[in-house]
Regions:
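Helix-loop "lid/cap" segments that line or gate small-molecule binding pockets
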Residues: 10-18
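A short, Trp-centered hydrophobic/proline-enriched beta-strand micro-motif
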Residues: 35-43
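Conserved hydrophobic/aromatic beta-strand scaffold that supports enzyme active sites
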Residues: 40, 56-58, 83-87, 97-99, ...
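Cytochrome P450 core scaffold surrounding the K-helix E-X-X-R motif
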Residues: 50, 109, 136-142
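A short core secondary-structure module
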Residues: 69-109
């Protein structure tokens, strides 16, 4: 559900609101906001993940419109989306955003099966074969990688908060269990090793909460930048991953069943740890901000 809401708000409604025409906003935003319409975001490709700027999807001029060819991979809500925000390179190699509608000739989607993570979330591949769209389908307010990257900043901000919630649930679930589960005549919460684990978990959760709270206040003030968001996404995903693992351990054998939430969170965090920028990419984004020297293209 968090992934669904993140895509709908940060990756679909945001670019339409920030970069769309008046007509595009009036057509799509009310329905998307009410949940009557579903959107998806097409940036990642089979051969271009972290290096999204190398995308192979093209948008060629064709009279007053465009012809779009290419494919997008790992797209949340892809097969159920009424509208897709698709990023493609034009004849001058400039990245532009387009709104593709469900049912357009040459536009199709297929679901990806066999996932062990985000199993409740629809993940799809998008295919565009000579999809003809009018110029009115183009997002007029942006060009270049600034467009999709600014969307990712919004989504990463939400992820930092979402991981805080995952971590808190894992902690609370494990704590309740540890107080009730008795071994050697007393609750396992009464042992020093277990208490040390809870101390570390709660300290990390508090750090996560303080980071996103500070980030939220900066966002409200208009002073938040993408480097800071990268730090929060990187930090909170890593901490949530550690906390989910520790919570699973405290639950013992019961922890590998779906009766308890940490194993589900642990599996889902593996996806979140990767999407919207890997741990390594965020490390380099922060490193560039610190040193002023880019370690990547």
């Amino acid at each position: 559900l968090r992934s669904f809401a993140s895509v709908q708000g940060s990756l679909v409604m945001y670019p339409i609101h920030a970069f769309g025409s008046v007509e595009q906003k009036e057509k799509w935003l009310p329905g998307l906001g009410k949940g009557e319409l579903v959107g998806c975001f097409g940036l990642t490709e089979p051969n271009y993940g972290s290096n999204a700027g190398g995308m192979a999807t093209t948008a060629k001029r064709n009279g007053d419109g465009w012809v779009i060819n290419g494919s997008k991979m790992w797209i949340t809500n892809g097969s159920i989306a009424d509208v897709a925000v698709v990023w493609a390179k034009d004849d001058d190699d400039v990245v532009r955003g387009f709104l593709l509608e469900k049912g357009m000739d040459g536009y199709s989607s297929n679901d990806i099966h066999g996932k062990l993570s985000l199993r409740a979330s629809i993940t799809s591949e998008l295919a565009m074969v000579n999809v003809q769209v009018p110029d009115s389908a183009r997002l007029p307010g942006v060009e270049g990688m600034k467009g999709p990257l600014s969307c990712l900043t919004q989504a990463r901000y939400g992820i930092a908060w979402g991981m805080t919630g995952c971590a808190a649930d894992c902690y609370q679930t494990a704590l309740k269990y540890a107080k009730e589960r008795k071994q050697f005549s007393k609750p396992i919460a009464g042992y020093q090793l277990t208490q040390a684990k809870f101390t570390e978990m709660l300290t990390k959760i508090t750090e996560m909460q303080l980071m996103v709270l500070r980030l939220g206040r900066m966002k409200d003030a208009g002073t938040m930048n993408f480097h800071q968001v990268s730090m929060a996404k990187r930090n909170n995903c890593a901490m949530a991953r550690d906390i989910a693992k520790t919570a699973r351990e405290i639950l013992g054998a019961n922890g590998v069943t779906l009766d308890y939430s940490p194993i589900r969170h642990l599996a889902n965090i593996e996806s979140v740890f990767t999407y919207e920028g890997t741990h390594e990419m965020h490390t380099l984004i922060i490193g560039e901000d610190i040193t002023g020297i880019s370690a990547f293209e």
